Structure formats: structure tokens, C-alpha cells
From Swiss-Prot:
Keyword Glycoprotein applies: no
One cellular component (GO) term of this entry: mitochondrion
Broad class of enzyme this protein falls into: hydrolase
Lineage start: Eukaryota, Metazoa, Chordata, Craniata, Vertebrata
Species this protein is from: Gallus gallus
Recorded name of the encoding gene: TUFM
Binding-site residues for Mg(2+), renumbered to this chain: 61
Name of the protein in its database record: Elongation factor Tu, mitochondrial
Length: 352
């Protein structure tokens, strides 16, 4: 049967950064309470992967929480507080996001998996890992600061890993003493977008305050701006093409064990589809393993079939926890090949 999965933040070592333009995958789920999912995932609208990027302390996690709060009013999300998203003790103590976190929500048109990426320069490798699977991203910029070092760096990295569509949220508008500064911030950001190769004229820029939305203050800057942002995401970020016809492939990012049940691997399905009961093959580190998928789950919900773009935990029979390592791949039997040569794009982190 399906397993119970809860989202969590996980440390992502640099060794996880994979080739093919750093198209890494984020460990989106870890095994939590060990019983069956009470709810089935309903695939009733297109699935899109998005995320928040931007400079440290510009409000990415606050905006993520605000989105879930606003959508919870219409049943489109489960409200997750800031503290629910920034779970790690060090993150709470320092007030910054270190590892990418993951939430889900739905608008009237789409289902979203949302990655909240860290903004601090020390954790840029985690930001790269969180951004690579995205179909589009939300660039969060504090109106009080304007463009900052990680604003530029995150936008550049997003472009390099293949994120082609961006929506801008100018946050903390309630804290600006002179409202005439807001158009200048927007102008500066459009110049940056053009410099990085994005369509500066057509990129939506929404001005608001995520904190106002969380605290039910100033509906125009708060709740209304979040709804405006969601509308911009719905319309500006196109539906991605999902490669569901080719053989199933899932890069493994997390490995867990449920005593008496089996081994769980987590990751984002890169192509194809897999169903409960399917046989699969795992390769990597010189090993070839066989297993059977006995359960699939996403965001606390069981699903009979996972498709390209889905963030899943798969329960496997026939494997021990110590047999599988992060960095291996799972796929359709006979469809995987080992390679010794690759092309990679390398981003060298500097002390600055």
C-alpha cells in the first residue's frame, strides 16, 4: 500500500549537483509517520513546478507562507506558517532559509509544487539544486533595498539552469517611506531582467507586502497583491511539456526505510511514468539493482501513477536501505545505460 510522506528541508551536498546544465533534483519529501496516506491525490488540473528566489531576507519564505494562507481561504492550500516552512533550528535562530523547502497549492487553473529557495550566499548550491527542476520562478525583491547581490546571482543561475519564465514580486511595499521610489525599483528590475536575457517588457511585476497578507493588514498591499501574483503566475508561466512517452526515469535524491514495509526513494520524475506494481531498475555507483514499486505518494497523498514532473516518494520491495544511495537513478528495466563521459556547466563559488 502507499506510504505516509511529509515534506521537509534536507541538506544538499555539492556532490549532488548533476550535469546537463546543473539539472539537479531536489529531495522534496522524507518519510514521516509510518502509516497509510488517508487521502488520494486527484490529478484534476495541470501540474507546474515554481519557486521563490532572491536576496536573503527579502521575504521569500514569508511570501510562500502568505500564498498558502490566501489560497487556504478558497480550499486551494493548507496554510503553512513561516515557522512550518523554516523548520531547522539554525534557520529559526538565524531567521534565514538554508535548505530549499517545498509546499503545494492549487489555483482554479493549476496545481503547483512550490520550492522556497535559500537566499544567503553561503547556501547558493542549495538554491541551484532547488531551482533546476522549476518551470518558472518568482523573483522576490524588497522595495526597501531594491536590487541586491543575490538578486542578480539568483536570476543568473535560474537562467543558466534553464528557467525561462520569471514573475517579479516587489515585497515590503508597506515599509517604503516614499511611494515614488516604487516605480524606480521596478525600472531597475526590468533593466536587470533584460540584462539576464528575459523579456523585460512582458514580465509581470507585482507590488505588495507578504507580511500584510499574513497579518490581514492593508488588503490592497496584502491579500490582493498575492492574488494578483497568482494570476500572473497562471498566465505568464506557460504549461510545461511533460515527456511522458519515453521510458520512466527518476534521479534519486532521498532514501529512507520503513521497517517491515521496505525502502523509500524520493525525487522528481524526469520523464515517463511509473505505476504501483511496476518493476524497476536502479543504477549508479557501479551497481544494478531490481525492485518492485509497491506504493507511490506525493504531498501526503497516495497516487496510483506518477508522471514526469511529479514529486514523489516510491516504496520499493526487494531492496535494503543500505543498497541505495542518493545520486543513483531509478528507471524502466532495460532502458538505462551507464555513461563515463558527460558535459557539465560548472559554477565556481567565490568567497565574496
Amino acid at each position: 500500500g502507499p506510504l505516509r510522506v511529509r515534506t521537509s528541508k534536507m541538506a544538499l551536498p555539492a556532490a549532488l549537483l548533476r550535469a546537463a546544465a546543473l539539472r539537479c533534483r531536489l529531495p522534496l519529501a522524507s518519510v514521516g509517520r509510518r502509516h497509510l496516506a488517508a487521502e488520494a491525490f486527484v490529478r484534476d488540473r495541470p501540474h507546474v513546478n515554481v519557486g521563490t528566489i532572491g536576496h536573503v531576507d527579502h521575504g521569500k519564505t514569508t511570501l510562500t507562507a502568505a500564498i498558502t494562507k490566501v489560497l487556504s481561504e478558497s480550499g486551494g492550500a493548507r496554510f503553512q506558517r513561516y515557522e512550518d516552512i523554516d523548520k531547522a533550528p539554525e534557520e529559526r535562530a538565524r531567521g534565514i532559509t538554508i535548505n530549499a523547502a517545498h509546499v503545494e497549492y492549487s489555483t482554479a487553473r493549476r496545481h503547483y509544487a512550490h520550492t522556497d529557495c535559500p537566499g544567503h550566499a553561503d547556501y547558493v548550491k542549495n538554491m541551484i539544486t532547488g531551482t533546476a527542476p522549476l518551470d518558472g520562478c518568482i523573483l522576490v525583491v524588497a522595495a526597501t533595498d531594491g536590487q541586491m547581490p543575490q538578486t542578480r546571482e539568483h536570476l543568473l543561475l535560474a537562467r543558466q539552469v534553464g528557467v525561462r519564465h520569471v514573475v517579479v514580486y516587489v515585497n515590503k511595499a508597506d515599509a517604503v517611506s516614499d511611494a515614488e521610489l516604487l516605480p524606480l525599483v521596478e525600472l531597475e528590475l526590468r533593466e536587470l531582467l533584460a540584462e539576464m536575457g528575459y523579456d523585460a517588457e512582458r514580465t509581470p511585476v507585482v507590488v505588495g507586502s507578504a507580511l500584510c497578507a499574513l497579518q490581514d493588514r492593508d488588503p490592497t498591499l496584502g491579500r490582493d497583491s498575492v492574488l494578483q501574483l497568482l494570476e500572473a503566475i497562471d498566465t505568464h508561466i506557460p504549461l510545461p511539456h511533460r515527456d511522458v512517452q519515453r521510458p520512466f526515469l527518476l534521479p534519486i535524491e532521498g532514501v529512507h526505510s520503513i521497517p517491515g514495509r521496505g525502502t523509500v526513494v524520493t525525487g522528481t520524475v524526469e520523464r515517463g511514468a511509473v505505476s504501483k506494481g511496476d518493476e524497476c531498475e536502479l543504477r549508479g555507483y557501479g551497481r544494478v539493482l531490481k525492485a518492485v514499486v509497491t506504493g507511490l505518494e506525493t504531498f501526503h497523498k497516495s497516487l496510483p501513477r506518477a508522471e514526469a514532473g511529479d514529486n514523489v516518494g516510491a516504496l520499493l520491495r526487494g531492496l535494503r536501505r543500505e543498497d541505495v544511495r542518493r545520486g543513483m537513478v531509478m528507471g524502466q528495466p532495460g532502458a538505462l545505460r551507464d555513461h563515463r563521459k558527460l558535459q557539465a556547466q560548472v559554477y565556481v563559488l567565490s568567497a565574496q
